[in-house]
Amino acid sequence: MAAADVRDMLDLPAEGQPRPHKKQKVVEKRPEGITRELFALLGERAPPIAINENRYKGRPKWQTKARVRPCARSDDLVLRHWQREPESTNIPAIEDTRAEGETKEQGEHKTADREYPFAKYNIKLKFSNRYTTDEYNRHLRSEDWSREETDYLMDLVEEYDLRWVVIADRYDFQPQRVDNTEETSSALVPSKQFRTMEQMKARYYFVAASMLALEHPPSEMSEAEFDLHERMMKFDPERERHRKELAALQLNRTADEVREETVLLEELKRITANEQEFVTERRELYSRLDVPISVSNATNYHNSQGLSHLLQTLLQADKSKKRRSILGPDGIAPTSGGQTPTIPNAPGSARDSSRADTPNGGTTQSTTTKKAAAAANREAAQQAIRTLTPAEEARYGVQHHDRLAPGVQFRSDRAQKLTQAKSHVQTQKLASALAELEVPLRLFMPTERVVKEFEKLIHSVNLLLDARKVAEKVESEIRVLEAAKEERERKAKELREKDKPEVKSEQQDNDVPIPPAPAPVAAGDASQTGQPAKTNEGQAELNGSSTTNNVADSEPSTQEQEGVSHKRSASVLSNGSDKSSKRQKK
């Protein structure tokens, strides 16, 4: 299909867009200083080294122009200025030098008559009209400034165009001599007085403001003139001097002082940025300090009843705080529609009572009027608003919420969240407790009353679980202490049994074989045979110690089982006494 057919089908004009132009080949200009053959050898690649010759800007050529006469001067002063020479043009040379000199002189005379180029910077300030003698005597007289010195100051100000630095530097007033009429007296020269820049400014501003007010009264002044008049009249020399001293101190600071000031400014910015956070923390701290100090004993909260009482007390305190934040400063809740809320007939505040006791009659009357107006408003509001009884609130479904969460919530979700504790173990304990009470975890009909009762039940179950946990902990501690006590008693009993003296019965004496008594030995024989006697005594001691050990190992409960007190022979008693004395020696 041809393009013309397509245009015909689409109802387009026959002539389409113009055809694009053919790209013309750009022929690069051969740089100067290189031959055509060498440039052709380079091809499309750029030369590795630039061949262009650097051409620096030449110095401007200056020439003197024709003379000019400044318009700001009254004399015939002629000045010459250096100006740049215009670009050279191909002007044919003039053969006659005289004609060239004449043309130059004519150009100089023409330029001397034309306007001076720097005349635009010659700006003269507009000063107020000079005062007359009558105006000076009535409005401008001063004890510190004379008429001649004031005239001298005004002349300097006009001459140097309010450049106060130059004026203060050139100020040199010479007071005139005072001539007396008497011939004998000589002329008196008053002392020269030094004037500061602030004093000169104050005097000039006072004269200028007074003359401006005489020419144009303040009621007829424009906004700019009135602003200027106010600034000149309110000029304070002492404040200006103090400002300059502070500026000098600021400029003469050392590097350490500048660094310290920078640190202080950064700290100030940080404190200002965190001011809101500080205010919030301070308010929270004050709210914590308002909590009353508990004087009760902590032992009251060791059982479940004390813990439940503590929880109810904290909830009640939290509700009272929220209620105080909702109510106004006078304890009145804000109402919509501009109606005044109802307040019972309460006594006046302490401030009203203190004002009523003052002897000032006007204050008492105003206080009484305020009280009467407040009472009238209360009565009107009480008539306009009707308070519902609890039965009516239950009938109409009126509810007072302490806090409402944003968004839509289902009661079933709220009841389900109550059964979920922080830990999985606590959740299982709560579920088992509800299973024992035969209460389902998910309510079938979660009405408002059912959800409230379910919340109370969950709260009681949590208290029960906490109390059970505490009880188990206490019982385990009791068992540990009892076991430790039994161990101590057992050890003490063993120690007592070891330290208890041991006594033999007659039956035990009969059971133990008595060794045969040694033969009597004469005194002479004993002296001759002293060694066998000592041997017999050692054997007796060994027998006695072995007997004692046997008695100690025997149980003392044999005498209690028999229940009969056996008689003891003299030999047994003597043996016991010998054993006890030997034990002490050991």
Swiss-Prot record:
Stated name of the protein: SWR1-complex protein 4
Extent of Polar residues compositional bias: 527-562
Domain of life: Eukaryota
Subunit structure: Component of the SWR1 chromatin-remodeling complex and of the NuA4 histone acetyltransferase complex.
Domain SANT residue range list: 137-190
Gene Ontology cellular component list: NuA4 histone acetyltransferase complex; Swr1 complex
Species whose genome carries this gene: Emericella nidulans (strain FGSC A4 / ATCC 38163 / CBS 112.46 / NRRL 194 / M139) (Aspergillus nidulans)
Role summary: Component of the SWR1 complex which mediates the ATP-dependent exchange of histone H2A for the H2A variant HZT1 leading to transcriptional regulation of selected genes by chromatin remodeling. Component of the NuA4 histone acetyltransferase complex which is involved in transcriptional activation of selected genes principally by acetylation of nucleosomal histone H4 and H2A. The NuA4 complex is also involved in DNA repair.
Compositionally biased spans, kind Low complexity: 363-383
Primary gene name: swc4
